[in-house]
């Protein structure tokens, strides 16, 4: 199966460009989802040509400019810190195209979310105001959700991207749910990656990834800027008191539909008043 928990790489890959996370088909069990996290110093430029993949470029922190062909989106990004808990700007780019990302401020943190390009689609700016915002859950199961590329969006062909905030003492991706069988309308098959940040950053959260038969059952202490791969199974997150959790989810599979199946042992939690 390979390691599900990925620590930061912190590799300098170009002048002023640091690769923090890199998840792809070659170094993981994933077939549909890819993820990169880069940090850019002021005026640094990251360049890439997409080969069979589409990409959502998320301006996590700082101001960036994204260019692809005749498209130039300047000074996008809304936050100095993800824990400002406001939506941010993103850019979607379809497969077979070359793009570059430039830092317009002292430092920028950028997420690159990948999945197979099933169709040729227009390059699109996804403004912060385009994100739908949800408050989900109750009791100790509350979280704030920013939907960047939900399944109702027609911007992408296979990619799903969402941000989730969970306050200390709460659980998210909970009750435990999974989406690893192509059994629509009951359940869709979607791989997933989690990129985590924690406030204050010396904290940690817990994430368990497990299947019904426990052939896969891994519980991880996840630290700031770690990533977790979910090729299959349930994948709940628990946040200790005193710390807040942020994660960016990337999902993709054979059909661009998010339908999940709750662990029946814990579904009773949803039935409480």
Swiss-Prot record:
Catalysis: reaction(s): 5-deoxy-D-glucuronate = 5-dehydro-2-deoxy-D-gluconate
GO BP annotations, alphabetical order: inositol catabolic process
GO molecular function, one term: 5-deoxy-D-glucuronate isomerase activity
EC number: 5.3.1.30
Annotated metabolic or biological route of this protein: Polyol metabolism; myo-inositol degradation into acetyl-CoA; acetyl-CoA from myo-inositol: step 4/7
Keywords from the named record: Isomerase
Presence of keyword Disulfide bond: no
Protein function: Involved in the isomerization of 5-deoxy-glucuronate (5DG) to 5-dehydro-2-deoxy-D-gluconate (DKG or 2-deoxy-5-keto-D-gluconate).
HAMAP family reported for this sequence: IolB
Family: Belongs to the isomerase IolB family.
Identification of the protein by name: 5-deoxy-glucuronate isomerase
Species this chain originates from: Listeria monocytogenes serovar 1/2a (strain ATCC BAA-679 / EGD-e)
Lineage, top ranks: Bacteria, Bacillati, Bacillota, Bacilli, Bacillales
């Amino acid at each position: 199966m390979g390691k599900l928990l990925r620590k930061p790489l912190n590799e300098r890959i170009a002048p002023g460009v640091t690769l923090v996370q890199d998840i792809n088909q070659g170094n993981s069990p994933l077939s549909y989802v890819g993820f990169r996290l880069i940090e850019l110093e002021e005026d640094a430029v990251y360049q890439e040509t997409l080969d069979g993949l589409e990409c959502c470029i998320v301006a996590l922190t700082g101001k960036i400019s994204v260019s692809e062909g005749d498209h130039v989106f300047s000074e996008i990004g809304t936050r100095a810190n993800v824990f400002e808990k406001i939506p941010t700007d993103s850019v979607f780019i379809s497969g077979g195209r070359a793009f570059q990302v430039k830092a317009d401020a002292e430092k920028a943190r950028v997420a690159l979310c990948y999945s197979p390009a099933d169709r040729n689609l227009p390059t699109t700016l996804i403004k912060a105001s385009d994100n739908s915002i949800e408050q989900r859950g109750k009791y100790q199961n509350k979280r704030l959700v920013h939907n960047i590329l939900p399944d109702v969006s027609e911007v992408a062909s296979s990619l799903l991207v969402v941000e989730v905030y969970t306050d200390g003492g709460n659980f998210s991706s909970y009750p435990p749910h999974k989406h690893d069988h192509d059994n629509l309308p009951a359940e869709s098959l979607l791989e997933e990656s989690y990129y985590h940040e924690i406030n204050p950053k010396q904290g940690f959260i817990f994430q368990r990834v497990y299947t019904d038969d426990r052939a896969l059952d891994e519980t991880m202490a996840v630290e700031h800027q770690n990533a977790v791969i979910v090729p299959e199974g349930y994948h709940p997150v628990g946040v200790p008191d005193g710390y807040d959790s942020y994660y960016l989810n990337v999902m993709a599979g054979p059909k661009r539909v998010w339908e999940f199946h709750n662990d029946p042992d814990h579904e009773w939690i949803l039935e409480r008043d």
